[in-house]
């Protein structure tokens, strides 16, 4: 019985020590990162909104959200991406 109580105490202490790490500001960032970009433009009519990926991501990207809630990564340096962003800002 003492062995079980000791193990339980170790588990509880370990859990308590690890809990603050999950509350760090980095853990709350749920913005996805993109590792590849779409090759061709999407139809503009299919896009309802966009957002930029976090600065913590290795590749900068614009994420377009389609009317069906699909997220598509695009290269922010491409002309069509900038034009779509401008169009979305105007509407």
From Swiss-Prot:
Annotated Gene Ontology cellular component terms: extracellular space
Disulfide bonds: 33-57, 34-73
Localisation per UniProt entry: Secreted
UniProt keyword annotation of Signal present: yes
Keywords: Chemotaxis, Cytokine, Disulfide bond, Inflammatory response, Secreted, Signal
InterPro entries: Chemokine_b/g/d, Chemokine_CC_CS, Chemokine_IL8-like_dom, Interleukin_8-like_sf
Signal peptide range: 1-23
GO-annotated molecular function: CCR chemokine receptor binding; chemokine activity
Pfam families in alphabetical order: IL8
Keyword Secreted: yes
Primary localisation category: secreted
Coiled-coil region(s): none
GO BP: any one term: antimicrobial humoral immune response mediated by antimicrobial peptide
Family the entry assigns: Belongs to the intercrine beta (chemokine CC) family.
Function: Chemoattractant for blood monocytes, memory T-helper cells and eosinophils. Causes the release of histamine from basophils and activates eosinophils. May activate several chemokine receptors including CCR1, CCR3, CCR4 and CCR5. May also be an agonist of the G protein-coupled receptor GPR75. Together with GPR75, may play a role in neuron survival through activation of a downstream signaling pathway involving the PI3, Akt and MAP kinases. By activating GPR75 may also play a role in insulin secretion by islet cells.
Protein name per Swiss-Prot or TrEMBL: C-C motif chemokine 5
Organism this protein belongs to: Macaca mulatta (Rhesus macaque)
């Amino acid at each position: 019985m003492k062995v079980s109580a000791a193990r339980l105490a170790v588990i509880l202490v370990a859990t308590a020590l690890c809990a603050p790490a999950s509350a760090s500001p980095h853990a709350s960032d749920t913005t996805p990162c993109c590792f590849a970009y779409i090759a061709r433009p999407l139809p503009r009519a299919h896009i309802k909104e966009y957002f930029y990926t976090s600065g913590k991501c290795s590749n900068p990207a614009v994420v377009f959200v389609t009317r069906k809630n699909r997220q598509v990564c695009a290269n922010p340096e491409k002309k069509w991406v900038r034009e779509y962003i401008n169009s979305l800002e105007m509407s």
